[in-house]
Amino acid sequence: MENKWLSEAFKGEVPSGFQGKVGWQSPSNIALVKYWGKKGKQIPQNPSISFTLSECCSETFISFEKADRLDFRFFFEGKENPAFGAKIEKFLLDYQAFFPFINQLSLTIESRNTFPHSSGIASSASSMSAFVMCLLDIESKLVGPSTGSGTEGSGTESTKALEP
């Protein structure tokens, strides 16, 4: 059986001159009962109970343009960050079946939090949520709205997305 999201993924040629900028914001959360373990590619083994910190958000902006191959730069809080960039690269490679158009784009990814880094508030899920929403937004500019892979990457990001 074919995966529903893969069957809806944009698989065509990105048009010449395709470019733009998208941005999304996703709130962080604090888990009261945390999920234990993961299955598959970052899918939670069991549910968790958490509450949303609506004033503590991760914001991601992606500038994109047509390219011969995937190329990207990642900036966190205004500074290029190769360590975070390596995690983004792994995600893009692992999930290129969901986002095949990325192999035809050059991306500049900018991410920041509305709360201090290393303050004890987890930002990995909210950052991944904002990032995935940006990718889905780029895809929607190619084919129209999608409901894509909301549980991929961190497990809880599907509960966090808020349009800026």
Located regions from the model:
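Active-site nucleophile and cofactor-binding loops and adjacent substrate-binding regions
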Residues: 121-123
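Short acidic-hydrophobic sequence patches enriched in Asp/Glu that either
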Residues: 87, 127, 158-162
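Beta-strand segments within the central parallel beta-sheet cores of soluble alpha/beta enzyme folds
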Residues: 107-110, 144, 155-164
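Short amphipathic alpha-helical face segments that pack within enzyme cores
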Residues: 126-134
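ATP-binding N-lobe of GHMP and related small-molecule kinases
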Residues: 1-119, 133-143
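Short Gly/Ser/Thr- and charged-rich N-terminal loops/segments
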Residues: 146, 150
